[in-house]
Amino acid sequence: MLRIADKTFDSHLFTGTGKFASSQLMVEAIRASGSQLVTLAMKRVDLRQHNDAILAPLIDAGVTLLPNTSGAKTAEEAIFAAQLAREALGTHWLKLEIHPDARWLLPDPVETLKAAEALVKQGFVVLPYCGADPVLCKRLEEVGCAAVMPLGAPIGSNQGLETRAMLEIIIQQATVPVVVDAGIGVPSHATQALEMGADAVLVNTAIAVADDPVMMAQAFRLAVEAGVMARRAVPGTRSSYAQATSPLTGFLEASA
């Protein structure tokens, strides 16, 4: 069970809505993933009507919607988008994204912290997408963010946990949930993140661009479940030396 702010989730896999070939395929994949929290870019939906091709199927699926501010380049733009989302969708939950450079889509740490502090004061449950910077994540936690979402690698790159060393520090020091976001390309990446101690992962591109998105969503569901189970089982410690799994000489002594 994962708790963030005022909500609890059985699944530790969050999903996105971009890059799917159709809204029907998107919903089928989300259902197959078991995800209960789905993020969507406000710039891609028609907020004036709930029969939007993306929004309507998600509402029907009964998932928790996490609007994001993707496309915002400044704190002011992100705050404006957040206010529109709250008014249109009736949710105070928000994934805060501010990335000024469209080529790399890396989060702006200064603007993200500025916006996060303002949005928390306005009553939002803020989940900021941020770099894998332990100092920044601690600052975001201190201003009241409900979770932090450090990247594993650039958005959509499928590179995996390239920031592993920093993620380990973030996880160790955090007192709010840590959701590894961006760069996860295959199910084993998700398993590794959960084994490290992350509370959840957010996956979009890896599922949406697969030849069979529904099957890939199922694979991620199982991978996340395996990661959570492995962490709870408490793996053995790593050793620089070999450790025998059975006596090496006992049978010789017994036969002597």
Swiss-Prot record:
Binding-site residues for 1-deoxy-D-xylulose 5-phosphate, renumbered to this chain: G156, A182, G183, N204, T205
Coiled coil residues, start to end: none
Keyword Transferase: yes
Pathway the protein takes part in: Cofactor biosynthesis; thiamine diphosphate biosynthesis
Lineage: Bacteria, Pseudomonadati, Pseudomonadota, Gammaproteobacteria, Enterobacterales
Family of the protein in this entry: Belongs to the ThiG family.
Organism: Citrobacter koseri (strain ATCC BAA-895 / CDC 4225-83 / SGSC4696)
Record-linked Gene3D superfamilies: Aldolase class I
Record-level GO cellular component terms: cytoplasm
Localization terms from the record: Cytoplasm
Record's protein name: Thiazole synthase
Protein's job: Catalyzes the rearrangement of 1-deoxy-D-xylulose 5-phosphate (DXP) to produce the thiazole phosphate moiety of thiamine. Sulfur is provided by the thiocarboxylate moiety of the carrier protein ThiS. In vitro, sulfur can be provided by H(2)S.
